């Protein structure tokens, strides 16, 4: 058990030293529209939205629990402990100025922390998932 906890906590130390979250500020799009657009963009990237949790009303915050099942299967096959961190969580937060922040854990830094436990193929899968999520968020912003 102790070894398992150490395996899970070491990456957090790496994350604490570097940028822990990837965030994008979205302006000019209402909060509820961002939620709909993000769900649609994630679906387009084959990132299944497994659950949506409205965390608070003031400020409004929602968490999407997302997973690409084929990515998850490839990673869990070689690193079953990853199940403690799955699925990916993407938050949507309404800021005081009316903008909306969308973010999630910085996956490249997560890969750095777990590198010795991941095969090169699993690392590639993580980085592809990161690319897919970033592209979905940028699509919400209006970029392609």
Curated annotation (Swiss-Prot):
UniProt keyword annotation of Cytoplasm present: no
Keyword Signal: yes
Stored CDD domains: DUF302
Pfam families: DUF302
Keywords annotated in UniProt: Signal
InterPro entries named in the record: DUF302 (IPR005180), TT1751-like_sf (IPR035923), UCP021774 (IPR016796)
Signal peptide range: 1-16
Name assigned to this protein: Uncharacterized protein aq_1800
């Amino acid at each position: 058990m102790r070894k398992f906890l150490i395996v899970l906590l070491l990456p957090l130390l790496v994350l604490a030293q570097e940028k822990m979250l990837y965030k994008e500020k979205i302006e000019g799009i209402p909060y509820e529209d961002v939620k709909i657009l993000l769900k649609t963009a994630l679906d387009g990237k084959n990132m299944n939205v497994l659950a949506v949790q409205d965390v608070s009303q003031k400020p409004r915050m929602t968490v999407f629990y997302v997973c690409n099942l084929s990515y998850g299967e490839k990673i869990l096959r070689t690193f079953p402990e990853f199940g403690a961190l799955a699925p990916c969580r993407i938050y949507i937060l309404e800021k005081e100025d009316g903008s909306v922040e969308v973010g999630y854990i910085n996956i490249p830094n997560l890969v750095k922390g777990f590198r010795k436990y991941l095969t090169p193929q699993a690392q590639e899968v993580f980085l592809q998932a990161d690319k897919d999520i970033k592209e979905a968020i940028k699509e919400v912003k209006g970029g392609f």
